[in-house]
């Protein structure tokens, strides 16, 4: 349970962030199970990549769970760590990485045959579902570099929320001042 000294507005923000991470993580686990069920051949490398995806989505669920309880402070710190691997995604000479546990707003620069045109492209991608892509030595030689603006914003948001909650906690514990509601 979130402590009573936290203002209603900040409790709501903690709860929304917590549920966002839980729902995104659960959706990611379900998508990963679905992809796994469609995979015809599973080598040790593919199994390792699936384990990595499950671990990342499970971590998102864990962060969300912490935010909904008394360990919200640890949940905020871990939530920042959860957002970091969601910032940058890339594809380059057969190697690719992309991960997001929820929505994404990405600025993307791409070049190659896998793009809309075969030249240099710049675009904005919006996604509402969790996504992961890990490629090792694939035949796709296109180039793509994306930055997830939502992940960057969430890191900023979480950091500001953490500062505000720390201020409320200090006011409550040391000065005995009740927070503004």
What are the language-model segments listed below?
Residues 1-181:
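Topology signature of small-to-medium multi-pass alpha-helical membrane proteins
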């Amino acid at each position: 349970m979130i402590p009573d000294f936290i203002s209603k507005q900040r409790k709501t923000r903690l709860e929304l962030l917590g549920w966002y991470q839980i729902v995104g993580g659960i959706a990611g686990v379900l998508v990963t199970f679905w992809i796994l069920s469609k995979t015809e051949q599973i080598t040790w490398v593919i199994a390792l990549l699936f384990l990595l995806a499950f671990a990342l989505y499970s971590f998102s669920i864990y962060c969300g769970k912490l935010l909904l309880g008394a360990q919200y402070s640890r949940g905020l710190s871990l939530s920042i760590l959860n957002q970091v691997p969601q910032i940058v995604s890339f594809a380059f000479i057969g190697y690719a990485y992309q991960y997001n546990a929820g929505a994404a707003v990405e600025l993307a620069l791409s070049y190659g045959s896998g793009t809309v045109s075969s030249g240099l492209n710049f675009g904005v991608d919006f996604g509402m579902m969790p996504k992961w892509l890990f490629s090792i030595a694939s035949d796709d030689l296109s180039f793509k570099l994306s930055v997830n603006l939502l992940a960057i914003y969430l890191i900023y948001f979480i950091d500001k929320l953490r500062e505000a909650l720390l201020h409320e906690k200090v006011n409550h514990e040391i000065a005995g001042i009740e927070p503004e509601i």
